[in-house]
Amino acid sequence: MRTANVILALVLLATACGGGAAVSTTTTLPPTTTLPPTTTTTTLPPTTTTTTTLPPTTTTTTTTTTTTTTTTTTTTTTTTTTTTTTLPPRPPTIDELLALDQPLNLAHAGGDQDHPHSTMYAFRRAAEAGVDLLEMDVRITADGVLVVHHDADVFGTTGGEGVVAEMTVAELQALDNAWWWSPTCWPCRDLADGDYPFRGVRTGVVEPPEGFTPDDFRIETFRSVAEAFPTLALDVEIKNRDDHAEAAIAALVADLDDLDRRDSVVVVSFSSDVVAAFKEVAPDVATSPGTDEMIAWILGGEALGDHPVVQVPPNYDGIEVLMEAFFTAVEEAGVEVWVWPDSTDQEAGGFYAELLDLGIDGIIAGRPAAFEQVLQDGGYVG
């Protein structure tokens, strides 16, 4: 009875839902998967999107975009390190001087006819005149130092007593090296005191010329002279020919090496033995031959040694040197000729000009300023 009632209720419910079809219990539902897009248009009420339009929060986060426009101006400071290595001044080499192909002006003892022989004062005056080389004589002292001095003793220029080789540098430099010099008569010994203008300057009795000191009138060391004139070449005569020659040669070579002066010096001696001994220890230094070698070359027809220049007087022992045979030998040997006047009366512009006319390559002048004027006037130098 209860079952019948249930069936009746189900039938009535199906009819009420509008289904007139038979209630096929097969319930063939569509495949659950392919459900149509549940477009659940849940039309919600306008969600008043509170766009809280806040006032421009002038949070000027001052991102001060410090436009550090890091314009990385890569200023590639190409530090062109111009290392101006200020090199010390250098004198011309002897080869460079000879290559000039023009007469050279050599100041004999600094220009002994114009200034006190072999003093720093004379050498400075010669440099001011524009000479090419400074000519000087050297001797060894008792304490092994090379000094610039002509004679074996000191009387000739200082009026003092003593032998250079037996005196120390200190003893020599205490002397007045301008004692006997006179512009009117060099080397006269019998003039009035007033005719010796620089007498007493070394000892402080007389004021030195402006720009100079008492030391400029003393016997000077070779090294000091060479250091004082770094841009001038030197013509150095070794005066020692005795037992002191070896010491003089050693001292000269040592000074040349210390000063890096080997290529800007010509070394000469009257003694061929001294020149040969020097060449043994310094074969790369320019030299001029000694007397014996010169005679054997000119008169004996022997070959001249390795010398770029010969130095001669116009006359030697009463014999005229500057003759045709001499110049023929010079041309064949391919050497330069430097002449040193052998008397005071030859120390003048006229005689200098005569020598130049002969084709002389250089003059060891006692008046270098006068010779420089001859060179300028004759158009020999630029």
Question: Which stretches of residues belong to each language-model region?
Answer:
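Sec-dependent signal peptide recognition
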Residues: R2-A9
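A periodicity- and composition-biased signal for non-globular, repetitive helical segments
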Residues: L8, T61-T62, D114
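C-terminal motif of bacterial Sec signal peptides marking the signal peptidase cleavage site
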Residues: L13-A16
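Phosphate-group recognition and catalysis centered on beta-loop-alpha active-site segments
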Residues: G18-V23, T85-G382
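Extracellular mucin-like PTS domains
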Residues: S24-L87
